[in-house]
Amino acid sequence: MIRMIRKFKVKGLRSPSLLIDMILNDTEEGILVVETDGEEQIKDIEKLLKKYNLKYEVDGNVVKIYVGEIKADKTINVVGATCPGPIMMVSDMLSKMKNGEILEIICGKNSLTDLTEGLKGMGNEIIKVEDKGDGTYRILVKKGEKKEEKAAVTKIDELFIINTTGTGNAEKAYATFMMADVALKMNLKPTIFLMMDGASLALKGECDRVKHPAFPKLGDLVRDILSKGVKIYVCELSAEFRGINEKNLEEGFEIAGAPTFLNYLSKPNVRPVWL
């Protein structure tokens, strides 16, 4: 029987569901990652998957099919651990595992982004992320190894805006969100990270208290940026120092930690801007 992850292409096939049906009959458990031509092939595949009542995800032209229950080689629970605890605990566990083995991670919401971003940056493959419905999440990760990239000219297409001053410097606070808006207009993808005193901007209602006569209320700029899909992270350690948690966190903001921060800084296509 075929187990774990199998990737294949069905481009050019008139009825890709026929091939997938044959593969499913020889698959006990695991994930099938299918690269398609597009909408028509995806519709053909979806009919088959609904017939078998199988869970699946569509990401662009790729269909990821879940078959059975994937069994992990090891499990670790990091619920309650604060940054950088979760990623260090998981990294230690992975260091004792072989490439290709599966680790099941149970974590809280605060460490979810850190773990998925950090683990991908280390060369591992995130197989599945599942909301358990009780405030915890289940991550299945396949151990891999980071491949050395050859030096090449990389186009800068992302901006990583880091604010460390928060409400203590209104000028830099305004600049943080205005710069993100300008980046969007220049076809750059902006991401905002609030750390140290910058974390004060993440306290619910705090941005609405900042207003300069020449500009709109800071809170309005923040909501506008969020509505355009810009991610705003706040450092978990800085948030904890200032008593900021999920209960008083500004809507739309996400708590993240060192792995997320370092993963962005390590991307060759990202230009960091410190404020």
Swiss-Prot record:
Signal peptide: none annotated. Pfam families: DsrE, TusA. InterPro entries: DsrEFH-like (IPR027396), Sulphur_relay_DsrE/F-like (IPR003787), TusA-like (IPR001455), TusA-like_sf (IPR036868). PANTHER family: SULFUR CARRIER PROTEIN MJ0990-RELATED, SULFUR CARRIER PROTEIN YEDF-RELATED. This is Uncharacterized protein MJ0760. It comes from Methanocaldococcus jannaschii (strain ATCC 43067 / DSM 2661 / JAL-1 / JCM 10045 / NBRC 100440) (Methanococcus jannaschii). The lineage of its organism: Archaea, Methanobacteriati, Methanobacteriota, Methanomada group, Methanococci.
